[in-house]
């Protein structure tokens, strides 16, 4: 029994009350046991609006489970004529409003492990075979249309429609219409299935980002699971698309009929009819293949997901997509309608600038897109070998097979490339870029989702990429080459000492180092860089059409067998004929790879230096420092970078990732061992006499060292630093946060008076050669003052200035930790019935013994110095 099957009887309270009032209005009394009977008996009661008002009231007063049970009963009992009025409200109440104010059922936060009851109810209600989809098909059979505001579409689509330029996707063809008031209030006339999927897809974009404090795992939320279910249902890897649910036996939902456009549009791409209509025109017997009636749902689902999730990029990218042929067509259209009655309310420049607001996809958005790409690869690779071959492309091929063959290049490739470029250029330089990286790498490896994929190889012997994937690599050359160069530029600006950043470099290097993949990419670049063969007619038709738009069953010219021409058409279709291509295996990219290899070597040494410094600090040193008996570190410790709790395990992971990444880069670009060894030797020359702390990258000029761009980057990111020591009077250093300001100033005045009053006596005591002289020198002489000098990477010179004599420093008594330790000592002494005076004497005696021992050790160390 399902969740909704447990309901034995359903009553809508408001309609039930209405049936009780009816006998007061009519002489003949009648009792109705269901709202449906009352609605059918009294149609003049305006049942649809009354039903909507009742459902709205129940959504506030009733529990969520009861609301869903009521909705299931309404969908089953009421006809489509009455259900179409509640459909827009129901869709908005589920997915939230388009402006993001209403969150609806909050599918992005609903998780089965947190709210198991609500989760199961929602998943059953919104399942592809559930009640909500049954309502969609019920309305679909009656050919109802619903208005969707153009203003909530992605920026590029909205701007082009407001300019009366038809977007390249056939999803918008014959759907744009004006509102009765005119102006810019444009709407799309969508059928119920399109309206539902539009809201479902846009709820990922329009809703506000999840708060940071709310820890929600995207892969466990209801929205993510629903996306996976819809993709598995409408883009099946096995079998055909299940037929739609219907209230009548054997009934099916018709495909959307063509609509007459309400306003004239110019197109900046070659658009054609939908897949279903094109397929029907080529088939002699349509009824023989039931899938031909339903393939439009799969096509619509994919188009909506791609348009809503990937159609986001900057104004510059929008202008770059316009081919010369398209611009001439748009210009001719504008000249022809310049004297027409209709003129856009916004000038052209304003319309193009209408979507310049920055769009930054969230990590959740990227994870959902990655799920789409992984499923599309599995969907496209589910073709049988005889179906995937070019010779199988005939009129006998089913629409679903055609859809599998052309789904990725026809619908996804261009918009995904622009989306990835936008992410690579605008995503913050932090560890969250991992989501974008994995999305990109998932698209680059379709062989991982093939049904005949090999067993994963070990790390020492990765599996070889089969030659059958060479066409995919060549047809997606820019995905591999240009985005790889973009990743190199990002990696050179990140802190590779961080394990998360080191992992990203390792992941990319590992994917591109798969055997035979680098050779395929290099072969594709060679095909593109070959001298261009002039083919006037074909070249104009393909190179000037920047988008793979329209239906993939459109009558294109015969397929060109020349591999070089195919690669050129791919690059020019995405970047234009005037693009400046940077080869991945060219000198510019190789220079970036060498810089990255140098940065990896530096990051390994930096991580090792941090690990060594942490290991050298003994436990007892921190305890004495807390008690205030250790020397004050006036220059601070090495804080090279802001690692997340850097420890030995993190250092080990970083070193492992960087070591393997360096080896993979060497394999991909055939770097010699001598080149990598040169980086290590050059790194050793910049170390100081301790062999640990490294100076930033510099060159020696006439006035000393000059920072290189790499050196500036190292300082900004905390990878390197110059060792700057405090050379002034330690007593005049700024007051620390762990010191009492008023007490420090009082102690400074007291010690200054003592030093001024007894300077001669202290100098005489320190000049003695016996134990008393050593004891006084240990306490009255600044330990590092005599050896202070100006540090310079080029040379060293002693500090010019007068020599200070022995002095007394009482500043350590102004520290909170010193006072707390003294109070703690007095408290412990009081527990043993020791008074303040005896305790003071004991502390003084203990310190004298400690100082005497340190004096002897210091003098013995000086005797052994050369």
Swiss-Prot record:
Q: How is its activity regulated?
A: Activated by phosphatidylserine and tumor necrosis factor (TNF). Inhibited by scyphostatin.
- What reaction does this enzyme carry out catalytically? a sphingomyelin + H2O = phosphocholine + an N-acylsphing-4-enine + H(+)
**Its Enzyme Commission number?**
3.1.4.12
> Membrane-spanning residues where?
822-842
> Could you tell me in which tissues this protein is expressed?
Widely expressed, with highest levels in heart and skeletal muscle.
Give the induction note. Expression is induced by DNA-damage and TNF.
Associated condition reads:
Neurodevelopmental disorder with microcephaly, arthrogryposis, and structural brain anomalies: An autosomal recessive disorder characterized by severe global developmental delay, severely impaired intellectual development with poor or absent speech, severe encephalopathy, microcephaly with simplified gyral pattern, hypomyelination, thin corpus callosum, mild cerebellar hypoplasia, brainstem hypoplasia, congenital arthrogryposis, dysmorphic features, and respiratory problems often leading to early demise.
Protein's recorded name: Sphingomyelin phosphodiesterase 4
